[in-house]
Amino acid sequence: MEVPGSSKKMIATQEEMSAAKIALGSRDMCAHLLIPLNKCRQAEFYLPWKCEDERHVYEKCEYELVMERMLAMKKIREEEALAKQNKLQGNAAVPLIPKTANA
């Protein structure tokens, strides 16, 4: 399964995520990294220094997804600003009320 607009592919299946009891909010393109991280956390009694490598890889994946979304939103905002600017310039060519109307 591939999400439109994302450079990453879904690797973990719905069945794998369901079996690993991954929360619905965490079922994104990095879920395949969260499954071994949660297994490590449970095996090591959630000691923060035990699963550093798995956590680092998972958090880097999440960071890359956030940055990808931010760049996409920035591009959308730039396109909207350009469209708005073009619309304003198009209206300026044909004034509806002459500037001398205030006299």
Curated annotation (Swiss-Prot):
CHCH domain location: 27-69
PROSITE patterns membership: CHCH (PS51808)
Keyword Membrane among record annotations: yes
Pfam families noted in UniProt: NDUF_B7
GO biological process: photorespiration
Disulfide bonds: C30-C61, C40-C51
UniProt keyword annotations, A-Z: Disulfide bond, Electron transport, Membrane, Mitochondrion, Mitochondrion inner membrane, Repeat, Respiratory chain, Transport
Residue ranges of the motif Cx9C motif 2: 51-61
Keyword match Cytoplasm: no
Subunit structure: Complex I is composed of at least 49 different subunits.
Function: Accessory subunit of the mitochondrial membrane respiratory chain NADH dehydrogenase (Complex I), that is believed not to be involved in catalysis. Complex I functions in the transfer of electrons from NADH to the respiratory chain. The immediate electron acceptor for the enzyme is believed to be ubiquinone.
Family designation: Belongs to the complex I NDUFB7 subunit family.
Protein's recorded name: NADH dehydrogenase [ubiquinone] 1 beta subcomplex subunit 7
